[in-house]
Amino acid sequence: AAIDIITCGEGDILMRGNLPTRDFLMPVLDRKNGLRTERLMSHVSLASIPEYPKLLALSDMTIIVNPNPTQKKAIIKNTADALKAFGYENPKLALMALVENVNFHMPDTIEAQRLVSEQKQHPFADCELWGPIAYDLIISKEACRLKHYDCPWSGGGFDGIIAQNLIAANTLVKSWLIHAQQ
């Protein structure tokens, strides 16, 4: 029923609510329902986090398990487009990694650096992109102060987080849910 509302133009967004992920995704991914396009489909979640001054997007925690660089660019573009649809004029996206420095033993940091560089030279998404950056630096100006890290959007300026993979994103959102209930 919700899919029909979206495909006929009477609705703009699907919300999962308390449905199991499989039950939510199966009709979404079914090509005959008409939601899929030529673009890579990814999931964007908006969350209210204690101590964070605005809603924060997180992607992708549901569809792309371990995105390659091309898929990561599509996820960034999808997230930026979703935020723009919600009224964010120039979304600021953080490419989350375990650490904020490029480390050749951590491929996610290298990929984040490459994506930020590519976005500066040949923009592929309508957003500002920063990374690699660890989660504590995304959320906390105090963490930046303690680590002597300079980021203009830390502590409330980021509009979204692009996680390294589905496991990182899913773990992060579940921790948000648990802490929000306490």
Model region roles, listed by residue range:
Residues 1-154, 159-164, 168-182:
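Anion-binding alpha/beta catalytic cores of soluble intermediary-metabolism enzymes, centered on
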